[in-house]
Amino acid sequence: PSMEGVARSMTDRLLDAFAGSAARRYGGEPVTELAHSLQCAELARDAGADDELQLACLLHDVGRFAVDPRLIFDKKDRAVGAGPDAKGHHDVGADLIAPYVPERVAWLVRMHADAKRYLCAIEPAYWGTLTPGSRYTLTLQGGVMTPETVSSLTRHPCLADAVRPRRWDD
């Protein structure tokens, strides 16, 4: 297939996924998955974020609803039945969009869970701001980052860009 055909197919797949997410609740939260994604992107826009950061905010949870649930291990209702090759929704989403978006956007989507782990490590009070569902998925995503991992991550030039969407997401 042509690149245009592949792009059209991917766009259709994402639009179908977003349409399906319009009716599904976001975990145990009082909002749908679609509303959650749109809200995060809108907060990014209102904060003056650049286009790539806004796109990453829109797509940060695409791995939750655009693929077979057995591929994902970090949702409370899917954790038990996840297959042996299951990944977190952040990795699934980043892998899904990587061929179609700038590298930074895919990296920001991939860092979505690690940004939560990082913030819990450097700001102990941040954990208290998380919903019960987000606290639960934190344990599935590796828990609070170790000091060694924090030290390694702080050297990344896009760390601040990964943390901003995390705060808008909560």
Language-model features and meaning:
Residues 1-2, 150:
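N-terminal amphipathic/basic-hydrophobic helices that include classical n-h-c signal peptides
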Residues 3-18:
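Acidic, glycine/proline-rich low-complexity segments that act as flexible tails and inter-domain linkers
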Residues 5, 28-31, 84:
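Short N-terminal micro-motifs specific to bacterial/archaeal maturation
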Residues 15-39, 72-79:
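Active-site flanking loop/helix segments enriched in acidic
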Residues 43-167:
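Divalent metal-dependent catalytic cores for phosphoryl transfer on phosphate-bearing substrates
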Residues 170:
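Charged phosphate-binding loop/patch that engages nucleotide di/tri-phosphates or the phosphate backbone
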